[in-house]
Amino acid sequence: MAGRSGDSDEDLLKAVRLIKFLYQSNPPPNPEGTRQARRNRRRRWRERQRQIHSISERILSTYLGRSAEPVPLQLPPLERLTLDCNEDCGTSGTQGVGSPQILVESPTILESGAKE
């Protein structure tokens, strides 16, 4: 069901039920009262939501034996990353948007340091 090898469906369902119960036990605040009272209720509600979120992450890591966060993306070394603006860079509002160019060799301009 979960699509992950090694994870028990029953453990996953148990964790999901527990997390669902935690979120249901913290309904949104009542919209009545003075502005300050409403603000305080919202602030306390958001803090409880943050606590529930952190508890949910701990539940997932305990029940499933792994972190809820995805594995970080492996990036190439910084020496291989370059900015290539030979193509149309667009207007000033869209500069820098797009996929990075990766060159196999470092450009000679960066290596020499001499002015031509």
Swiss-Prot record:
A motif (Nuclear localization signal and RNA-binding (RRE)) lies at residues 34-50. Residues 36-47 have a biased composition (Basic residues). Residues 23-49 are annotated as: Disordered. One of its GO terms (cellular component) is host cell cytoplasm. Asymmetrically arginine dimethylated at one site by host PRMT6. Methylation impairs the RNA-binding activity and export of viral RNA from the nucleus to the cytoplasm. Phosphorylated by protein kinase CK2. Presence of, and maybe binding to the N-terminus of the regulatory beta subunit of CK2 is necessary for CK2-mediated Rev's phosphorylation. Keywords: AIDS, Host cytoplasm, Host nucleus, Host-virus interaction, Methylation, mRNA transport, Phosphoprotein, RNA-binding, Transport. InterPro entries: REV_protein. Transmembrane segments: none annotated. Its main location: host cell. Changing S106F: Almost no effect on phosphorylation. HIV-1 lineages are divided in three main groups, M (for Major), O (for Outlier), and N (for New, or Non-M, Non-O). The vast majority of strains found worldwide belong to the group M. Group O seems to be endemic to and largely confined to Cameroon and neighboring countries in West Central Africa, where these viruses represent a small minority of HIV-1 strains. The group N is represented by a limited number of isolates from Cameroonian persons. The group M is further subdivided in 9 clades or subtypes (A to D, F to H, J and K). Escorts unspliced or incompletely spliced viral pre-mRNAs (late transcripts) out of the nucleus of infected cells. These pre-mRNAs carry a recognition sequence called Rev responsive element (RRE) located in the env gene, that is not present in fully spliced viral mRNAs (early transcripts). This function is essential since most viral proteins are translated from unspliced or partially spliced pre-mRNAs which cannot exit the nucleus by the pathway used by fully processed cellular mRNAs. Rev itself is translated from a fully spliced mRNA that readily exits the nucleus. The RNA-binding motif binds to the RRE, a 240 bp stem-and-loop structure present in incompletely spliced viral pre-mRNAs. This region also contains the NLS which mediates nuclear localization via KPNB1 binding and, when the N-terminal sequence is present, nucleolar targeting. These overlapping functions prevent Rev bound to RRE from undesirable return to the nucleus. When Rev binds the RRE, the NLS becomes masked while the NES remains accessible. The leucine-rich NES mediates binding to human XPO1. This is Protein Rev. The lineage of its organism: Viruses, Riboviria, Pararnavirae, Artverviricota, Revtraviricetes.
